[in-house]
């Protein structure tokens, strides 16, 4: 039997991904139409079906988008409904509410509730008053995307709770959660939190040590937990005297009830579908195929909510399971013992996703899954037995003892293992790199590759060669010799220069109720694999340009700070200088006309002998034929004094966030830029950028880029000068790699098929 289901599922996934990335762009849709017309005319039947699956996937993000339009955005609303899921306990609890009424009218949408200060449990009926907000897409690469997350919950938007009241409700889910929580409170606080997280999917405690050693999957109900429960219930019912078929059916019913009880998270739903297919394959006399069952589970999950595809829970669950099914027999065939082959195959499947989402991987995770999980398994099964039999004094005491001891040993050993050296930290992997990783993994381990005869070995070289030929020009796109990112930091300035050295010009930092350092700047630097800043330039000491510099020096290795001469010794600035002294970070006072060479990158520093914003540092950055001018918050007077010192540039960082008191006509005429970049916050209180500045730039046909509407603006040396928005950069690095993946996919599809027993 052939395995077309794998190809059809990959086609569906590719379609969903393309629909999300490219949306309804006409050029993309036309190219898809031309490609699939050719495919349906010349392609084989299996390729036609794969093309149809791709088109289905392409439409799913639009057909299953739960978000409302902006009609309610910013409005004060009152919603009544039932709590469906709880995401966090404590002072800042978050809920998923299944709405029933909104402002008195019946609704069926779900809402993500923030700022909940009272603890609630699933099944509880509540009334929420607050401001409705449509989620915003992430404007910087690699960071948490609130819009996709809200979509993955199936919610129409979020509500910042101002007032919450409980309503009378008698619901089976509420009663069940209250019973489980009351019984778990009989354990110690740490054990209670661990069991709440693993059984119910919410609870207090961070358990950072488990994340450090790759055991974070036990903190949310997943396939691992379902496997333990199925093993326990099936054998318990068999020992009770039920026949195998009856015991299997009752086990399936109990597991689906448990899934409904905690809200069917993606990993648990996958396991439920696969286990159900396994159980019912026997009476229907159908051969169970684990990979096909995995594909069926993926189809069901993605039809329920295609936005799950972009969430860690879905990718880690399906990626780990797929690699377990494919690599486990291959590793055993290579002579790896089955005890080691099991966690190793899962680790290989999870590796790229862990590097993508977390930027780090711990090799000790393989041994941790072998040595530590048995202790957790005892605690988990013991806790379920305690929920059922804990009311009997003797048996309850015995079960409680074993649960406490095994969970305590598990957590102590986890904390010790987290202290071991060897953790690998790197720049976050992007999606094209992950695709290539899995293709190469397939080429290395698949039975199709192993069974190709020598006379057909040209296929392997053709496929692999095509891949790398397509990938070669992308290397410069992904890792160009010069990249300058104008980070979407809000109302402020922050620019990161990557080349031979890592440099920063300003850090942003004015709070406006949100910490842009902890929320944007520092996570982005870590995702980019940056731990050292070789030079930090501060144009002037306004908070929106430099306030994050204090924490930057604390959390990263900064080798030098460069300041303009105009300084006001505020308490913040004095603390900053003391911290630099404590961390032995050199602080340099710049002089006008000073030239800095960072490899093949040259920075010309200039400033006027003026105070306030007009004392801002202005910099001309030159690398090969690429030239960029930073102006800080300099106004007309500074521009007039300094413009003769600068040669024309290709890119202008427009002064003072687009204020009408900056960027004069004579200045623009002198430096003659082709691109203008405006760094400002969305709907900021200053009205930046001012319309007068926009009109000046448009009159001179300067292409305008804005961080408030277009997100992070990237300038890079990619076959010359390239300026792109966050959305454009995502697309341009994806297309060539996609072409390579298509060639490889077609080559593998048309290659020699293999028998099922070669896989499993």
Predicted regions and their residues:
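N-terminal leader/targeting segments
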Residues: 1-71, 148, 152, 158-163, ...
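Internal transmembrane alpha-helical bundles of multi-pass membrane proteins
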Residues: 9-13, 264-452, 634, 640-652, ...
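Membrane-interface helix/helix-cap signal primarily in integral membrane proteins
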Residues: 57-217, 519-528, 532, 566-568, ...
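Aromatic-rich juxtamembrane segments at the membrane interface
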Residues: 152-274, 279-280, 535, 560, ...
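Active-site environment of divalent metal-dependent phosphoester hydrolases
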Residues: 226, 266-268, 512, 541-546, ...
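Core dinuclear metal-dependent hydrolase active-site scaffold
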Residues: 306-309, 415-535, 581-648, 709-738, ...
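Active-site metal-binding motif and surrounding structural segment of the metallo-beta-lactamase
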Residues: 500-503, 509-563, 644-659, 672-677
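Cap/insert and terminal regions of metallo-dependent hydrolase folds
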Residues: 641-711
